[in-house]
Amino acid sequence: IRIAKECVKFNERCFVRLLGDMRSYNYVVDITPDIEGSQYRMRAIDFDQQSYEGRSSFYQPKYFKENNPIIFLGQEHMNVPTMVQYQMEERSLIANRIKASMRRTNNLFKVMVKDQISNPEKVAQLREELSYHHKTDVFDQCDSMGSLVYENLKLVLAKDFKQSTTTFDFPRIE
């Protein structure tokens, strides 16, 4: 169950920062022994698809068939409220990390919003899909991937923002 819990958190980390293509061969599972058994942490090892693609599902590891075994494990052992709880925990951790490094984060976003990370068609597609996913129009003025990442991060980390918490209750991909 711990690995399934970490999968929910990893999916959230990838989606919040728009890190794409996290198939099972693009991340590692870091296992740390502890008093209760082992702690698991999924860590990305391939960053070439950071904020480039236009499809929002590309930024959610749960949609890659290579990840199905671990996704199905989570579906089997966790209910939706538990998954949402883990998503909210991860958002809280991300918010605390950002607060601890606010100046560096601001400097990074100053560069990202000006950089042409992707082409205009993909920016437009992702802008539309994020607006639909989050049920908001905050992305309407975004004209770069950097500004989409910034607004996505701001939105998901906003206190009490819960409408976009996603679950793993999607059709099986064979």
Predicted regions mapped to residue ranges:
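Conserved kinase catalytic-core segment
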Residues: 1-59
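C-terminal catalytic region of ATP-dependent kinase domains
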Residues: 35-174
